[in-house]
Amino acid sequence: MTEKERILKKIESDTSRPVLFSESRGGSENQLRLLFKYVPDEFFKGINLILNNANPNLLEKDKINVLWMQHFVNQEEAKNLGSKEFVDQLDYIIFNSHWNFEKFQYQFKIPENKSIVIRNAVEKIEHHEKPNDKINLIYHTTPWRGLENLLNIFKKMNLKNVELNVCSSTEIYGKKFSEKYDQKYKSIFDECKNSNNINYLGYLDNPKIIELLKKMHIYSFPSIWPETSCISAI
């Protein structure tokens, strides 16, 4: 078993996580996949890499305990960072932005000497000429980040030469998550499907999103969510 396989096996078996890693294509999970793509396996030897879960049961005494925290400070999986006993057992805490680190330090007095910021990244997207027959807008993140607000604004504008493409679904976090939360946002998705000049595309995987972005003019994202390092905007 490689070091990366060992880490992934543990994350996959962590039942306290709200999503199953293998099914999820969320930002945090994709950042780990990107890290594993470019960093050699040998660099993870002796490392217990914990993803977004300040759960004391995930600590290992014989390894270097590294918590990679991409969640905002108010999330359930982050609360144990308020425990000095837990933080003392961590060797390093990685945050995805200086802003996010500052919020945790303010809330929980996280020690600076254990804190590292590694900002989020995406694969390079080459510049493409955009179509000029109409203006294409896109919303390509989860519904609770501002989709309802966007729909209200877009419908009131009622512009004939503008189309809104909505790529949003609870499916991004996998079957386990979708079965629990999809019904909550069904009315918003139905509104997208039944509105003029709105193309509801549901869940699209990352390569398809990137291809679609090449034709888009504006990322329409009236966010109501505390983004820690917004990958969809990057």
Give the positions of each predicted feature.
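N-terminal pre-catalytic "stem/leader" segment of glycosyltransferase-like enzymes
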Residues: 1-58
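Active-site proximal beta-strand in glycosyltransferases
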Residues: 47-77, 91-95, 116-118
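Conserved donor-binding/catalytic core segment of Leloir-type glycosyltransferases
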Residues: 129-146, 151-154, 165
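Short acidic alpha-helix that forms the nucleotide-activated donor recognition element
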Residues: 205-216
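Carbohydrate-associated surface elements
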Residues: 99, 121
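Acidic donor-binding loop of glycosyltransferase active sites
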Residues: 214-228
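Short alpha-helical segment that forms part of, or immediately flanks, the ligand-binding pocket
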Residues: 210, 228, 233-234
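Nucleotide-activated donor-binding/catalytic signature segment of Leloir-type glycosyltransferases, i.e.
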Residues: 178-207
